[in-house]
Design a protein with these regions (language model features):
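The feature encodes the CheY-like receiver
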Residues: 72, 102
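Non-catalytic signal-transmission and effector/linker regions of two-component phosphorelay proteins
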Residues: 1-12, 17-36, 44, 51, ...
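A Lys-centered signature of the CheY-like receiver
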Residues: 120
């Protein structure tokens, strides 16, 4: 399906590096996706925000979390594990966005419930592939099949 989203995506960026946050914003703008962006720099605040989203009395927008593995205090794996244990976590599409090209990290996080794994590239143009991945997930991800009328 390649139609515009009728409901903006909720994108939660859990990233403590301001340069990477800037690049993610750049990618989202370049791909002209409708989105609401929430930038959070640690796992505890991200979990608090997810709890707040669950409490809101409004239709749920498709939610994508772009999660770095290396965070202060608790790492991204801990947050992924926690998100996947709560009922609201099953509605969140989690994309690991990391500098780790280690196959063991990829296998482990996908086994833990991440929906995709994106290695931060060295070249700016390659970062645009993250936008393609988000578009693919927004339009075709089975996590939101029941809400196809809203995307």
């Amino acid at each position: 399906m390649d139609t515009p989203l009728s409901t903006p995506l909720t994108i939660i960026v859990v990233e403590d590096n301001p340069v990477d946050v800037y690049l993610i914003r750049w990618v989202l703008t370049a791909h002209e996706l409708p989105y609401t962006l929430h930038v959070i720099d640690n796992a505890d605040q991200a979990m608090h925000y997810i709890d707040e989203l669950a409490q809101q009395d409004r239709p749920k927008a498709p939610t994508i979390m772009l999660l770095d593995l290396t965070l202060p205090q608790r790492d991204g794996r801990d947050l992924l594990r926690q998100v996947r244990t709560i009922p609201e976590g099953s509605d969140i599409c989690v994309v690991i966005v990391t500098s780790s090209n280690n196959p063991a990290d990829r296998r482990e996080t996908l086994r833990m419930g991440a929906d995709a794994y994106f290695v931060k590239p060295f070249h700016l143009n390659e970062f645009m592939q993250l936008g393609n991945l988000i578009k693919h997930l927004a339009f075709d991800h089975p996590r939101w099949e029941d809400s196809a009328s809203t995307v």
